Protein backbone atom coordinates (compact mmCIF):
# COMPACT_ATOMS: atom_id res chain seq x y z
CA UNK A 1 0.00 0.00 0.00
CA UNK A 2 1.51 3.39 -0.99
CA UNK A 3 2.29 5.84 1.76
CA UNK A 4 -0.20 8.70 2.11
CA UNK A 5 0.79 12.01 0.57
CA UNK A 6 2.08 14.86 2.67
CA UNK A 7 -0.33 17.39 4.13
CA UNK A 8 0.93 20.00 1.67
CA UNK A 9 0.26 17.74 -1.31
CA UNK A 10 -3.24 16.94 -0.10
CA UNK A 11 -4.14 20.55 0.54
CA UNK A 12 -2.63 21.63 -2.78
CA UNK A 13 -4.83 19.04 -4.52
CA UNK A 14 -7.83 20.40 -2.61
CA UNK A 15 -6.94 23.91 -3.73
CA UNK A 16 -6.77 22.77 -7.35
CA UNK A 17 -10.21 21.17 -7.09
CA UNK A 18 -13.08 23.23 -8.46
CA UNK A 19 -16.77 22.43 -8.05
CA UNK A 20 -18.36 23.35 -11.37
CA UNK A 21 -21.89 22.30 -10.45
CA UNK A 22 -23.43 21.52 -7.09
CA UNK A 23 -26.92 20.03 -6.82
CA UNK A 24 -29.78 22.21 -5.56
CA UNK A 25 -31.10 19.30 -3.48
CA UNK A 26 -29.70 18.70 0.00
CA UNK A 27 -28.81 15.52 1.86
CA UNK A 28 -31.86 13.81 3.33
CA UNK A 29 -32.33 14.16 7.09
CA UNK A 30 -34.22 10.93 7.71
CA UNK A 31 -33.05 8.74 4.86
CA UNK A 32 -30.11 7.81 2.65
CA UNK A 33 -28.95 9.98 -0.23
CA UNK A 34 -27.16 8.66 -3.30
CA UNK A 35 -24.85 11.40 -4.56
CA UNK A 36 -23.59 11.03 -8.13
CA UNK A 37 -20.14 12.48 -8.76
CA UNK A 38 -18.46 13.34 -12.05
CA UNK A 39 -14.78 14.21 -11.63
CA UNK A 40 -12.99 15.57 -14.70
CA UNK A 41 -9.18 15.68 -14.89
CA UNK A 42 -7.15 17.38 -17.62
CA UNK A 43 -4.47 14.93 -18.85
CA UNK A 44 -2.94 17.33 -21.37
CA UNK A 45 -2.66 16.98 -25.15
CA UNK A 46 -6.41 17.41 -25.53
CA UNK A 47 -7.20 14.40 -23.35
CA UNK A 48 -9.23 14.23 -20.15
CA UNK A 49 -10.33 11.54 -17.76
CA UNK A 50 -13.95 11.36 -16.57
CA UNK A 51 -14.62 9.40 -13.41
CA UNK A 52 -18.20 8.82 -12.41
CA UNK A 53 -19.73 7.01 -9.51
CA UNK A 54 -21.95 7.16 -6.45
CA UNK A 55 -21.20 8.22 -2.92
CA UNK A 56 -23.85 6.90 -0.56
CA UNK A 57 -24.58 9.31 2.27
CA UNK A 58 -26.20 7.25 5.00
CA UNK A 59 -29.07 8.66 7.00
CA UNK A 60 -27.54 11.32 9.26
CA UNK A 61 -27.01 9.96 12.75
CA UNK A 62 -26.07 11.74 15.92
CA UNK A 63 -22.90 9.95 16.93
CA UNK A 64 -20.13 10.33 19.45
CA UNK A 65 -16.81 11.80 18.22
CA UNK A 66 -15.11 8.55 19.32
CA UNK A 67 -17.22 6.53 16.88
CA UNK A 68 -16.73 9.06 14.09
CA UNK A 69 -12.96 8.85 14.30
CA UNK A 70 -12.99 5.11 13.55
CA UNK A 71 -16.12 4.48 11.49
CA UNK A 72 -17.18 7.53 9.47
CA UNK A 73 -15.54 6.71 6.12
CA UNK A 74 -15.86 3.40 4.33
CA UNK A 75 -13.67 2.44 1.35
CA UNK A 76 -11.78 5.74 1.25
CA UNK A 77 -7.98 5.84 1.44
CA UNK A 78 -5.62 7.62 3.80
CA UNK A 79 -5.44 10.81 1.72
CA UNK A 80 -9.20 11.32 1.86
CA UNK A 81 -9.26 10.59 5.58
CA UNK A 82 -6.40 13.00 6.21
CA UNK A 83 -8.13 15.79 4.29
CA UNK A 84 -11.49 15.31 5.99
CA UNK A 85 -9.93 15.03 9.45
CA UNK A 86 -8.24 18.39 8.91
CA UNK A 87 -11.47 19.94 7.66
CA UNK A 88 -13.46 18.58 10.56
CA UNK A 89 -10.95 19.92 13.06
CA UNK A 90 -12.11 23.43 12.18
CA UNK A 91 -14.62 24.89 14.61
CA UNK A 92 -17.28 25.58 12.00
CA UNK A 93 -17.26 21.93 10.87
CA UNK A 94 -17.62 20.16 14.19
CA UNK A 95 -21.33 19.62 13.58
CA UNK A 96 -20.52 17.04 10.91
CA UNK A 97 -19.05 14.82 13.61
CA UNK A 98 -22.38 14.86 15.40
CA UNK A 99 -24.22 13.70 12.32
CA UNK A 100 -21.68 11.00 11.52
CA UNK A 101 -22.45 10.99 7.81
CA UNK A 102 -20.92 7.81 6.41
CA UNK A 103 -19.74 7.91 2.82
CA UNK A 104 -19.28 4.73 0.83
CA UNK A 105 -17.87 4.75 -2.69
CA UNK A 106 -19.64 2.47 -5.13
CA UNK A 107 -20.41 1.99 -8.80
CA UNK A 108 -17.24 3.74 -9.95
CA UNK A 109 -16.35 3.93 -13.65
CA UNK A 110 -13.89 5.95 -15.70
CA UNK A 111 -13.08 6.76 -19.30
CA UNK A 112 -10.51 8.81 -21.20
CA UNK A 113 -11.87 11.04 -23.95
CA UNK A 114 -10.67 13.83 -26.19
CA UNK A 115 -11.77 17.41 -25.73
CA UNK A 116 -11.42 20.53 -23.63
CA UNK A 117 -12.09 19.93 -19.94
CA UNK A 118 -13.94 23.23 -19.50
CA UNK A 119 -16.22 22.60 -22.46
CA UNK A 120 -16.98 19.04 -21.37
CA UNK A 121 -17.73 20.31 -17.86
CA UNK A 122 -20.17 22.87 -19.28
CA UNK A 123 -21.95 20.19 -21.30
CA UNK A 124 -22.21 17.88 -18.31
CA UNK A 125 -23.47 20.74 -16.15
CA UNK A 126 -26.25 21.46 -18.65
CA UNK A 127 -27.29 17.80 -18.51
CA UNK A 128 -27.18 17.79 -14.69
CA UNK A 129 -29.35 20.90 -14.50
CA UNK A 130 -32.04 19.08 -16.47
CA UNK A 131 -31.91 16.04 -14.19
CA UNK A 132 -34.16 17.00 -11.29
CA UNK A 133 -34.28 13.48 -9.85
CA UNK A 134 -30.58 13.07 -9.09
CA UNK A 135 -28.25 14.62 -6.55
CA UNK A 136 -25.08 15.02 -8.54
CA UNK A 137 -22.04 17.23 -8.87
CA UNK A 138 -19.55 18.15 -11.58
CA UNK A 139 -16.00 18.59 -10.31
CA UNK A 140 -12.68 19.41 -11.99
CA UNK A 141 -9.69 18.11 -10.06
CA UNK A 142 -6.14 16.75 -10.38
CA UNK A 143 -5.97 13.26 -11.85
CA UNK A 144 -3.79 11.89 -9.04
CA UNK A 145 -6.10 12.89 -6.18
CA UNK A 146 -9.62 11.73 -7.00
CA UNK A 147 -10.57 11.07 -3.38
CA UNK A 148 -9.41 14.49 -2.21
CA UNK A 149 -11.53 16.12 -4.91
CA UNK A 150 -14.48 14.01 -3.77
CA UNK A 151 -13.98 15.13 -0.17
CA UNK A 152 -13.94 18.79 -1.24
CA UNK A 153 -17.28 18.29 -3.00
CA UNK A 154 -18.85 16.19 -0.25
CA UNK A 155 -17.78 18.60 2.47
CA UNK A 156 -19.34 21.51 0.57
CA UNK A 157 -22.58 19.54 0.15
CA UNK A 158 -22.65 18.62 3.83
CA UNK A 159 -22.07 22.23 4.89
CA UNK A 160 -25.05 23.31 2.80
CA UNK A 161 -27.21 20.52 4.25
CA UNK A 162 -26.33 21.01 7.93
CA UNK A 163 -28.69 23.93 8.72
CA UNK A 164 -31.68 22.14 7.20
CA UNK A 165 -30.81 18.80 8.80
CA UNK A 166 -30.20 20.41 12.20
CA UNK A 167 -33.55 22.21 12.05
CA UNK A 168 -35.44 18.99 11.32
CA UNK A 169 -33.54 17.02 13.98
CA UNK A 170 -34.04 19.75 16.57
CA UNK A 171 -37.78 19.83 15.87
CA UNK A 172 -37.90 16.20 17.02
CA UNK A 173 -35.76 16.87 20.10
CA UNK A 174 -32.97 14.63 18.82
CA UNK A 175 -30.23 17.18 19.47
CA UNK A 176 -31.16 17.69 23.14
CA UNK A 177 -28.84 16.08 25.69
CA UNK A 178 -30.04 13.34 28.01
CA UNK A 179 -28.47 10.46 29.94
CA UNK A 180 -24.74 10.92 30.46
CA UNK A 181 -24.75 14.08 28.39
CA UNK A 182 -25.55 12.07 25.26
CA UNK A 183 -27.80 13.42 22.51
CA UNK A 184 -31.32 12.00 22.66
CA UNK A 185 -30.84 10.48 19.20
CA UNK A 186 -28.01 8.29 20.51
CA UNK A 187 -30.04 7.29 23.57
CA UNK A 188 -33.03 6.42 21.38
CA UNK A 189 -30.85 4.29 19.10
CA UNK A 190 -29.30 2.40 22.03
CA UNK A 191 -32.70 1.87 23.68
CA UNK A 192 -33.97 0.36 20.44
CA UNK A 193 -30.95 -1.94 20.30
CA UNK A 194 -31.57 -3.11 23.87
CA UNK A 195 -35.22 -3.81 23.05
CA UNK A 196 -34.25 -5.85 19.98
CA UNK A 197 -31.41 -7.80 21.65
CA UNK A 198 -33.16 -11.16 22.04
CA UNK A 199 -30.10 -13.38 21.56
CA UNK A 200 -26.50 -13.55 22.74
CA UNK A 201 -25.32 -12.72 19.22
CA UNK A 202 -27.33 -9.50 19.22
CA UNK A 203 -26.11 -8.71 22.72
CA UNK A 204 -22.53 -9.14 21.52
CA UNK A 205 -23.23 -6.76 18.65
CA UNK A 206 -24.70 -4.26 21.09
CA UNK A 207 -21.65 -4.53 23.33
CA UNK A 208 -19.37 -3.80 20.38
CA UNK A 209 -21.46 -0.80 19.43
CA UNK A 210 -21.33 0.62 22.95
CA UNK A 211 -17.55 0.27 22.95
CA UNK A 212 -17.23 1.73 19.45
CA UNK A 213 -19.32 4.70 20.55
CA UNK A 214 -17.14 5.10 23.63
CA UNK A 215 -20.20 4.93 25.93
CA UNK A 216 -20.01 1.40 27.34
CA UNK A 217 -19.60 2.61 30.93
CA UNK A 218 -22.82 4.63 30.70
CA UNK A 219 -24.82 1.49 29.89
CA UNK A 220 -22.59 -1.07 31.59
CA UNK A 221 -25.01 -2.21 34.33
CA UNK A 222 -27.91 -2.46 31.92
CA UNK A 223 -25.81 -4.38 29.41
CA UNK A 224 -24.62 -6.99 31.90
CA UNK A 225 -28.16 -7.45 33.19
CA UNK A 226 -29.24 -8.13 29.61
CA UNK A 227 -26.34 -10.52 29.11
CA UNK A 228 -27.21 -12.39 32.32
CA UNK A 229 -30.83 -12.87 31.21
CA UNK A 230 -29.86 -14.20 27.79
CA UNK A 231 -27.32 -16.76 29.01
What does each model-identified segment do?
Residues 1-156:
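Terminal low-complexity "docking" segments
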Residues 124, 128-147, 161, 185-191, ...:
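Extended amphipathic alpha-helical regions
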Residues 177-231:
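Alpha-helical oligomerization segments
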Residues 136-183:
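Short helix/strand-capping turn motifs
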Residues 56, 60-63, 100, 104, ...:
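Alpha-helical context
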Residues 33, 46, 86, 90, ...:
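Surface-exposed polar/charged interaction patches
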Residues 102, 106, 110, 132-139, ...:
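Generic, low-specificity signal for short hydrophobic/alpha-helical stretches with a mild N-terminal bias
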